[in-house]
């Protein structure tokens, strides 16, 4: 189907969650390309991960997908429809963003999960149970009505993450963006976080940025970025067999790198 410019911003539903980048090249300053000819397809319900050193382009891919920046070269499609045709509302509501350091605001635990949306108490509770946040919330003096201080400073980083997971699930997104969601977690909460993430990803298309390769070994596809280009792709096992950049990164993290 051909889409005309006057249809921009009119599509207000993400049906399946297929994602495609076609020949996307992007520069923040118009001089230096931070992404060069990026091509990939993610089928509905799949998890793909992007790995690479700082500045390799991982975050830029997410920035473009979330429409934080406009790109001039190439196409980004959701369900074979150019991303410009989707309304900002549907992109905001149906793409769940899980950040490294989730933002909690002054209010109650429930209002932080609800996030200004018309979500019933029962749904707030169901979302919390789904991500295993219910247990610690129930133990708070006022439970879901417990006050949250600015930035949620009274909670551990793991608890903040679980509240953010509940917030994401309550909105029932079609697509998840995970930005190193386990970077700042105390080890005892790590297992709960990993289990919850797996449940959240189930049936949803997921784009994950990872620094720790141990967290993305089960991804359907891993893309290795270097200086704005995808230099390797495959499953964890396939990439190890290639003995390329991913293999080196994995060896380094596993602490087996020989001097």
What is the predicted function of each stretch?
Residues 3-259:
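ABC-type nucleotide-binding domain
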């Amino acid at each position: 189907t051909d889409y005309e410019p006057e249809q921009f911003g009119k599509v207000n539903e993400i049906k399946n969650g297929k994602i495609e980048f076609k020949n996307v090249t992007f520069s923040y300053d118009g001089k230096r390309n931070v992404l060069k000819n990026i091509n990939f397809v993610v089928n509905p319900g799949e998890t793909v991960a992007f790995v690479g050193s700082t500045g390799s382009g991982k975050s830029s891919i997410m920035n473009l997908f979330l429409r934080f920046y406009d790109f001039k070269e190439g196409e980004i499609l959701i369900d074979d429809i150019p991303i410009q045709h989707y309304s900002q509302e549907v992109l905001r509501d149906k793409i769940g963003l899980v950040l490294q350091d989730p933002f909690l605001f002054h209010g109650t635990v429930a209002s932080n999960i609800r996030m200004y949306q018309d979500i019933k108490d029962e749904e707030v509770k169901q979302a919390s149970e789904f991500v295993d946040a219910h247990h610690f919330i129930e133990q708070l003096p006022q439970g879901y009505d417990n006050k949250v201080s600015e930035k949620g400073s009274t909670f551990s980083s793991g608890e903040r993450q679980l509240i953010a997971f509940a917030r994401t699930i309550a909105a029932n997104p079609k697509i998840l963006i995970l930005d190193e969601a386990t970077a700042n977690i105390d080890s005892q909460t790590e297992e709960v976080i990993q289990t919850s993430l797996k449940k959240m990803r189930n049936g949803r298309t997921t784009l994950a940025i990872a620094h720790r390769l141990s967290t993305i070994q089960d991804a359907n596809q891993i893309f290795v970025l270097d200086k704005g280009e995808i230099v390797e792709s495959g499953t964890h096992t396939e990439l190890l067999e290639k003995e390329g950049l991913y293999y080196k990164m994995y060896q380094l993290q596993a602490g087996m790198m020989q001097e």
